[in-house]
Amino acid sequence: MKFKRILFLIFIILFFGGQLTLASGLSSNTASAPDASHLSLDEVLKKIEKHYSVSGFTAYFTQTSTIKAMDITDSASGKAFFKRSGKMRWEYETPDRQIIITDGNTLWVFRPEDNQVMIGKAPSFFQGGKGFSFLSDMKEIREKFSITLEKETEEGFFILKLLPIEKTLDIVKIYLWISRNTFDVVKILTYNSYGDETRIVFTNIQLKQELDDSLFSFKTSEGMEVLNLDEQQGQ
């Protein structure tokens, strides 16, 4: 049961889904925001890319995911770290501690409570924009998605609609909420072909010139249970 629980949480983040709904309480500091209503899609994308041109960033996150067929909703929160290219670290604090790490080549999922780590090949889990991989390099948005700027938008935000160029059951549609003031990606909503929904809201976003590479690697220790994630994925 524990192993199934771990896989459930992995697929929530890596094979996510979501729908276009607005989170209450989402703030963009619009009082001091410049008038950006005239910007074209290309101009918005260029500003996002420029804003995230530093090597990495950190943020706190809250995540709500729903598996429609099972009528299950799961919520989680923690802190995330992103670094070009392809490096990510998601530290889940609630409801259970677990850490999802990738250096772009290898994926580690560690549960401290069970002293257990699952190891797999990162590309098979992150290809085609899965697993929020574009957050480690915002230029991937142009490369992996067909993008439109939504006409109906929430005050203080641009809303981008992303359709994967490479069709997959795991991702059908993604929406990004972009602050008109800072050009931070403050919210992500996704859904898959099964109608499953995932919402991620970022707060306290901190752009970093440098994040230590040790954050994006993992070393096993004596006595730790090691499982092959690629084998489990193929079953």
Predicted ranges, named:
Residues L9-Q19:
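Bacterial N-terminal signal peptides
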Residues V54-G56, S75-S77, K83-S85, P95, ...:
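Extracytoplasmic
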Residues K79-G129, T198-R199:
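An acidic-aromatic
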Residues T21-T73, T220-Q235:
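N-terminal leader/targeting segments and the immediate start of mature chains
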Residues E140-D230:
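Gly/Pro-enriched, hydrophobic low-complexity segments
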Residues K68-A69, R89, D96-I99, V109, ...:
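Short beta-strands and strand-coil junctions in structured, solvent-facing domains, enriched
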Residues N115-F157:
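Flexible, surface-exposed loop/linker segments and immediately adjacent secondary-structure boundaries
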Residues M1-F8:
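Bacterial N-terminal signal peptides that target proteins for export
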